[in-house]
Every structure is written in structure tokens, then in C-alpha cells.
Amino acid sequence: MQIILLEKVANLGQLGDVVKVKDGYARNFLIPSGKAKRATEANLQAFEARRAELEAKQAEILVDAQARGEKLNGVTITIAQKAGVDGRLFGSITNADIAEAIIASGVQVQKSDVRLPNGPFKAIGEYNVEVALHHDVVVEIQLVVNAEA
């Protein structure tokens, strides 16, 4: 299926690109989430009429993400969790826990912005965590997991 991208999509293209994707990906994800529209003549003309507006909106989102990235760059987040004698946690630290701690420090993030490629943390220690605020803005923060007293 041919679609018009309404915003930058990772591994697919930029705003305004007409790309061919599998039907299910377009119907079940891209179109319902507002990231794309079918590439019909009417939609192409409507997109060209709104192109400047969409580009301005995307630029505003990028500037906001960069501002939040500046606040987060180099920040150390500390989370206390119950742990056993050997340093293993009872439970784990997930991206939702980390996002909650970042929000408590004063920067708005979604839990989906926190990247944990190796899964949740299950031991006390210091970890580097990537926070992807935008496709072009990825910030690394320091996470310290302590045993709760």
C-alpha cells in the first residue's frame, strides 16, 4: 500500500515521503496512530496544502524535545528498591519506574521514551539508560539503584 507520511517514522522516512509498506502495517498502525494517510490523489493535494503547517508542528515538537533533552543530559536518577543480601532486587526496575522518577525530577517523559534493550534491571548498581525524547533527540542518563533501608 502506498502511504504519505505525516511525521518522521523510524526506518521508513521523513514527513511528506510517499512510501510503500505492507497493508497490515499501514491499516493497523500507521494510519490509526495519525502517522500516515493513504496516498490517493485527494490526500496528496490535501497534504501539499497543509505541508507548511505540518512541518511547523514537527519543528515545534523537535524544539520541545531538544529543550527537555538539555534538562535531562547528564542527570543522575536514584531509585530505592527492596533487595536481598546478594544485591538482587525483589521485583525489578522497569521503564515505567524510571519514567516516573524522571517526571518527579521535573521533566515530562513517556514510559515508551525510556529504552531498556536488555530488559528491566534486577540488581542494585549504576546503569546508563537511554531516553529517546524524539527520533533525533536521544539522551543518556545515569540510573543508580540502591537497596531500600
Swiss-Prot record:
Keyword entries, A-Z: Ribonucleoprotein, Ribosomal protein, RNA-binding, rRNA-binding
Residue stretches spanning the membrane: none
Gene: rplI
Protein name: Large ribosomal subunit protein bL9
A GO biological process held by the record: translation
Reported function: Binds to the 23S rRNA.
Family of this protein: Belongs to the bacterial ribosomal protein bL9 family.
Single GO cellular component term: ribonucleoprotein complex
InterPro entries named in the record: Ribosomal_bL9, Ribosomal_bL9/RNase_H1_N, Ribosomal_bL9_bac/chp, Ribosomal_bL9_C, Ribosomal_bL9_C_sf, Ribosomal_bL9_N, Ribosomal_bL9_N_sf
